[in-house]
Amino acid sequence: MRERSQDSQAGLTLYVGLFGHLGMLHRTKYSRFRNESITSLDEGSPGGSVGNKGSSPPPYPALAPHLPTEDATVSSQESPTALCTLIPRMASMKLANPITFLGLKTFCLGTKQVSRLKLQENQDQTPSRPASPESNLNRTGPAPAPDPDQVGRRPTSLRPDTCPLPGPGEPSPRSKQDGPPLQHLLGNGLNYCVRYMGCIEVLQSMRSLDFGMRTQVTREAISRLCEAVPGAHGAIKKRKAPVKFLTTVLGKSNLQFSGMNIKLTVSTSSLTLMNLDNQQIIANHQMQSISFASGGDPDTTDYVAYVAKDPVNQRACHILECRSGMAQDVISTIGQAFELRFKQYLKNPSLNTWEREEVLVDGAPEDRDHDYYNSIPGKQPPEGGISDVRIQAQATDQMAYCPIRCEKLCYLPGNSTCSGVYKNCMGRSRPIGIPHERAGQGDTPSLRHFWRVDLFDDPCYVNTQALQSMHSYAGNQSSALPQGSPWHLGKAPETVQPGATAKPGSALALPHIRQQLWDEECFHGKLSRGAAEKLLVKDGDFLVRESVTSPGQFVLSGLQGGQAKHLLLVDPEGKVRTKDHVFDNVGHLIKYHMDNNLPIISSGSEVRLKQPIRKYDNTGLLPPKK
């Protein structure tokens, strides 16, 4: 691209015609922009100029006499800056004829904005460096202000060219050098500007898959949505044939909001997706409704995927595109939100002991209800960006009552190799309401029968806190309860008082409750979820059953709005209770709601008890052995 005159060694002539080909801008050696490109012309050559050593380089003001008044300002302002920036090696050369800059005017105008952006970025990174006289001359004249929509940002910041910044008063996303945004996570949340790619239905319970398969499901969902969304750059360049089992796990895609720039708000309570154009909330997933999240994997560096349940999409994998290396930052923030939520519980367990915040879909088939992570005892997640809200110890199809009270999610901010990994440290903590210390995960099957604290098989029920110990409850039942069916009780339920604390329960209450239930016509004994739903025909139908997978759990199954609801009646302390009241027994609860025509409220939905399904209608039920 440069030619040296063979007839004379006194100077070096630059032929403008050689620069007519603009393809040189794509060569690798010109892709790096350095501060040396705007320094003095003699700085790059220790021995002076390349041409005549005895001559001194002509100053830039000498350009003015050779040019018209209008062109002199433009050339001195634009041409030297663009030329020296794009071709750093030309900084050490002396131009034989300054008038040739007129020929480069058109070429420089095309690259003017790029060079200014890079120079602006370099000056931001080195603010203490004094400007040379040549650089000051390059900026003479009324230089236009850089467009804020095109100024480059650091990798962990928001990309203004893809999504506008949050409005005033909103917390800006943190960078990796900043401290943990605890005040934002505990408050309104931390905002990230990302691109929503859509979601794809997850048909199979994630609980039944090991960690490797769950990662394959996430990556396959990312690949499918990248192929379906126009303009998406696929994370996996070489598309491999999907594994056969993925066809049974992933279902249809929902591209209603795909390709939309959204604001992701991460807090200790939920993940919120908001459209930046019209401030419409696309989705609001409570923390307990999220199965697991992954981000920053080697093959999906620009994407964050999380599986959540909501009434619209049911169980679905939602994909977010995070450019400029923001994916690892987003998944780390989500992990910190999990950790902070657990710490909140440790400080005030009475407020969170039975708190249920998620709104999930009821009535799904029994093998599809609980995609709660790490249900295999002793199984630990591999490294690679997997985090989970629902790590549990029990190898059953039910989740732990409070997802954060029986587990400890460890965040490892100092370990770069595990920056996106959140491991289960549940063996170090002691579950509330269990009178015996846990020796480890090996003894978790002993907890299966008596210490399941979920109020719903399908966890939708909002519950509060326990009141009294089951020891006194079991001791007073024999004298306080009348003989016969407890349906005839007219006693008002006990109201839950705020600030009441839970005391250790007693396993003696469970046989006592089972014996009482055998006297009830609506109690069907051990009955699976699917079998119970087949008996529910009309709205208002209900029955009481004992869980097949978790003996000792007594469930009220009812039909409301065509959907089956499953309410766990007895808490870990042996109390029969709802959100606001504590009842003497199951019959007392049913009679109270039927006589007063009151619904059982469950996370905004209602369950009304109208027609009991009697056990004699279930021909497969055998009489109890006494």
Curated annotation (Swiss-Prot):
InterPro entries: CEP152/SHC-Transforming, PH-like_dom_sf, PID_Shc-like, PTB/PI_dom, SH2, SH2_dom_sf, SHC_SH2
Region annotation CH2: where it falls in the sequence: 1-185
Annotated SUPFAM superfamilies: PH domain-like, SH2 domain
Superkingdom of source: Eukaryota
Known tissue expression: Expressed in both brain and skeletal muscle; widely expressed in brain namely olfactory bulb, cortex, hippocampus, striatum, thalamus, and brain stem (at protein level). Only expressed in melanomas. Weakly expressed in normal melanocytes and benign nevi. Highly expressed at the transition from radial growth phase to vertical growth phase and metastatic melanomas, when tumor cells acquire migratory competence and invasive potential.
Cellular localization per UniProt: Postsynaptic cell membrane
Gene3D superfamilies for this protein: Pleckstrin-homology domain (PH domain)/Phosphotyrosine-binding domain (PTB), SH2 domain
Modified residues (Phosphotyrosine): Y422
Cysteines engaged in disulfide bonds, as pairs: none
Entry-linked SMART domains: PTB, SH2
Free-text description of this protein's post-translational modifications in UniProt: Phosphorylated; the phosphorylation is enhanced by EGF. Phosphorylation at Tyr-422 is required for the interaction with GRB2.
Residues of the PID domain: 186-369
Gene Ontology CC annotations of this record: postsynaptic membrane
Function (record text): Activates both Ras-dependent and Ras-independent migratory pathways in melanomas. Contributes to the early phases of agrin-induced tyrosine phosphorylation of CHRNB1.
Self-association and partners: Interacts (via PID domain) with phosphorylated MUSK (via NPXY motif); undergoes tyrosine phosphorylation downstream of activated MUSK. Interacts with GRB2; the interaction is dependent of Tyr-422 phosphorylation and increased by EGF.
Official protein name in the record: SHC-transforming protein 4
Organism in which the protein naturally occurs: Mus musculus
